[in-house]
Amino acid sequence: MASLKDLEGKWRLMESHGFEEYMKELGVGLALRKMAAMAKPDCIITCDGNNITVKTESTVKTTVFSCNLGEKFDETTADGRKTETVCTFQDGALVQHQQWDGKESTITRKLKDGKMIVECVMNNATCTRVYEKVQ
């Protein structure tokens, strides 16, 4: 089973399935959905004990958040939502649970065959994004 340290590094998006549908479920407008769907972001994850930082860089936008595992924090997402978020590490996966305006979404990052698989879920919309390590 992967450790949190195994997720550290720079990851590049290689495949994406269902991302536009997931963004639509989040309430993201059409223009931003189209731009975001074309972006090929890098995800940089760093860990220092229980503190993690996740930075997502693309030509469209760069976002970053840092948190302590298990502690709620205020996050501003790439699409501008203000969420109350908590990250945990369970069963070899980094789980990011967001809540806002009575809604919720979960983003799970895990390793499979040397790739980082990111699964985003809101209601019945599920998106799977596959990243390869570049550093």
Swiss-Prot record:
Modification N-acetylalanine, positions: 2
Encoding gene per record: Fabp5
Residues with the Phosphotyrosine modification: 131
Expressed in which tissues: Widely expressed.
Reaction(s) the record says it catalyses: hexadecanoate(out) = hexadecanoate(in); (9Z,12Z)-octadecadienoate(out) = (9Z,12Z)-octadecadienoate(in); (9Z)-octadecenoate(out) = (9Z)-octadecenoate(in)
GO MF terms, alphabetically ordered: fatty acid binding; identical protein binding; long-chain fatty acid transmembrane transporter activity; retinoic acid binding
Organism, scientific name: Mus musculus (Mouse)
Lineage: Eukaryota, Metazoa, Chordata, Craniata, Vertebrata
Gene Ontology BP terms: glucose homeostasis; glucose metabolic process; lipid metabolic process; lipid transport across blood-brain barrier; negative regulation of D-glucose transmembrane transport; phosphatidylcholine biosynthetic process; positive regulation of cold-induced thermogenesis; positive regulation of peroxisome proliferator activated receptor signaling pathway
Binding site for 1-eicosanoylglycerol: 43, 56, 109, 129-131
UniProt keyword annotations, A-Z: Acetylation, Cytoplasm, Disulfide bond, Lipid transport, Lipid-binding, Nucleus, Phosphoprotein, Secreted, Synapse, Transport
Motif (Nuclear localization signal): 24-34
Name listed for the protein in its UniProt record: Fatty acid-binding protein 5
Lineage top rank: taxon: Eukaryota
Binding site for (9Z,12Z)-octadecadienoate: 129-131
Assigned protein family: Belongs to the calycin superfamily. Fatty-acid binding protein (FABP) family.
Role of this protein: Intracellular carrier for long-chain fatty acids and related active lipids, such as endocannabinoids, that regulate the metabolism and actions of the ligands they bind. In addition to the cytosolic transport, selectively delivers specific fatty acids from the cytosol to the nucleus, wherein they activate nuclear receptors. Delivers retinoic acid to the nuclear receptor peroxisome proliferator-activated receptor delta; which promotes proliferation and survival. May also serve as a synaptic carrier of endocannabinoid at central synapses and thus controls retrograde endocannabinoid signaling.
Membrane-crossing residue ranges in chain numbering: none
Entry domain remark: Forms a beta-barrel structure that accommodates hydrophobic ligands in its interior.
Binding site for hexadecanoate: 131
Subunit architecture: Monomer.
Disruption phenotype: Deficient mice display resistance to diet-induced obesity, decreased adipose tissue and imporved glucose tolerance and insulin sensitivity.
Residue list for modification Phosphoserine: 3
Subcellular location: Cytoplasm; Nucleus; Synapse; Postsynaptic density
Binding of N-eicosanoyl ethanolamine, residues: 131
Alphabetical list of SUPFAM superfamilies matching this protein: Lipocalins
Gene Ontology CC terms: cytoplasm; extracellular space; glutamatergic synapse; nucleus; postsynaptic cytosol; postsynaptic density; postsynaptic density, intracellular component; synapse
